[in-house]
Each structure stands twice: as C-alpha cells, then as structure tokens.
UniProtKB/Swiss-Prot annotation:
It comes from the Eukaryota. Belongs to the complex I LYR family. LYRM9 subfamily. Pfam families: Complex1_LYR (PF05347). It comes from Homo sapiens (Human). Disulfide bonds: none annotated. InterPro entries: Complex1_LYR_dom (IPR008011), Complex1_LYR_LYRM9 (IPR045291), Complex_I_LYR (IPR052151). One of its GO terms (cellular component) is mitochondrion. This is LYR motif-containing protein 9. The gene is LYRM9.
Amino acid sequence: MAPLPGAELVRRPLQLYRYLLRCCQQLPTKGIQQHYKHAVRQSFRVHSDEDNPERIQQIIKRAIEDADWIMNKYKKQN
C-alpha cells in the first residue's frame, strides 16, 4: 500500500520531492511534519548532483518505500 495515491506515477526527482512533501502533510502533528519535511529537503540536496538514471530510480523506489513505512507507523499509533 502506498502512502498516497500516485506513488506509481513518480518517475523524476522533482515529482518525488512534491510527492514526499504531500505525504508529510498527512502526518499527525506539526512537529512530526516539520521533522520529515526537513529530512526530505536534506535528502533532496544531498542527492541533487546524482546523474545516473539507474541510481535515481533506485533512490525513488527506496524513498517511496520509506514513506510507506513512516505513514503506516503513524497510522498504527493513532
């Protein structure tokens, strides 16, 4: 299960960035939202110079899996 509809449509880094920020808006408190938004921004900056298409797809896949895990974690707590 993907955290938000549209995960299967993410193909490019900018799409991933927007998708992950939308996921952050679904988290329960402002503090948690800000924490994960900061983490998304930092990751985007760290990987901004990546130019290998295979590696980019690997990063996108992993980021969506991580977002799924985080969303499920907070769903179970509520």
